[in-house]
């Protein structure tokens, strides 16, 4: 087909990309010309992915001392026992690195570097929920929070909603998926607003979107710099002190392999155990049970107020997942994983 005769066709152009890496780093550093990270030592986990070259460059140029791990991408080792999802499950590995090098905190990216989470000096995870709260406060104090609103998904911790209500920050909840968060932010951006505003949204996983006239999607490195900026401006001595102000509710997320995806509403034993959980946990705030859309797994989120512990929730999660497996013809003893969302780490079966 001769495209030259097609109406409405716009031709691209070839761009010499030899300096694009440097230009991106320059852009991030220039955006924070007044920010100095001197005196901070950061442990960077780059997931053997996209952040491997960029993250050490950016934080070093901003003045931080950096300790870098998992920054040797070889094509097949991306996210392999590295990066944000690994650290959420096994936080002890990064904590050992931080202790050895006496780092102030850890900064952890995923493979394509659109997500970032932190680890405070005590070894606790600072995830997307914490980051939304911290950044929401920061941008509102600066008078730059678009529509005084933060957007997140149904998987957010319940304490986040309470936190924003106490600070008169509006909260919009969407379905799970960054595309739904982005769609709500785009609606806010389309409304008349003062210049210099930032639309803030994201997910518990650490996918944070800072939307303005020049930025429209998640960028883990940019989010990380803003989070550290917010921490330094908070007056708190440690990241742990800042993150603890959010008081997250006990929350677990479980996943289990299933042989077949049978309508959960038709599984009598599953519904019976679900009703039992609701009766046994008077402080239960949310129970979300669904099949994965992409894997042969069932996923469960349990959350309760502080009358209950993470361990209590984990016990109930194992029981409900086992019931789903039994009712779907899944072999006994198949994969079940329960993640402590509140503090990080996998919870062993009791």
Label each residue range with its predicted role.
Residues 1-101:
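Gly/Ser/Thr-enriched, mixed-charge loops and adjacent short helices
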């Amino acid at each position: 087909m001769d495209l030259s005769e097609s109406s409405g066709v716009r031709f691209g152009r070839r761009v010499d990309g030899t300096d694009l890496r440097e230009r991106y780093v320059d852009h991030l550093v220039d955006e924070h010309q007044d920010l100095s990270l001197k005196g901070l030592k950061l442990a960077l986990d780059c997931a053997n992915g996209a952040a491997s070259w960029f993250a050490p460059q950016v934080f070093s140029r901003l003045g931080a001392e950096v300790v870098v791990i998992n920054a040797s991408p070889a094509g097949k080792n991306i996210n392999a026992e590295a990066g944000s999802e690994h650290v959420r499950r096994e936080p002890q590995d990064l904590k050992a690195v931080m202790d050895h090098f006496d780092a102030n905190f850890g900064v952890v990216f995923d493979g394509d570097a659109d997500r970032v989470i932190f680890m405070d000096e005590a070894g606790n995870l600072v995830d997307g929920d914490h980051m939304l709260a911290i950044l929401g406060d920061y941008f509102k104090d600066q008078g730059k929070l678009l529509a005084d609103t933060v957007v997140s998904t149904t998987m957010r911790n319940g304490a986040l909603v309470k936190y924003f209500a106490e600070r008169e920050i509006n909260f919009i909840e969407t379905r799970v998926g960054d595309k739904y968060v982005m769609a709500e932010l785009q609606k806010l951006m389309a409304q008349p607003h003062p210049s210099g505003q930032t639309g803030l949204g994201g997910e518990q996983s650490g996918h944070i979107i800072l939307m303005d006239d020049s930025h429209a999607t998640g960028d883990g490195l940019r989010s990380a710099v803003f989070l550290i900026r917010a921490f330094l401006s908070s007056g708190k001595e440690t990241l742990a002190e800042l993150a603890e102000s959010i008081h997250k509710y006990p929350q677990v997320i479980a996943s289990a392999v299933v042989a077949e995806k049978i309508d959960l509403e038709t599984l009598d034993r599953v519904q019976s155990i679900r009703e039992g959980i609701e009766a046994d946990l008077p402080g239960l705030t949310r129970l979300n049970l669904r099949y994965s859309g992409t894997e042969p797994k069932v996923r469960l989120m349990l959350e309760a107020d502080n009358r209950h512990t993470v361990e209590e929730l984990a016990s109930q999660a194992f029981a409900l997942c086992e019931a789903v497996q039994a009712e779907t013809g899944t072999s006994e003893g198949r994969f079940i994983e329960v993640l402590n969302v509140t503090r990080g780490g996998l919870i062993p079966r009791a």
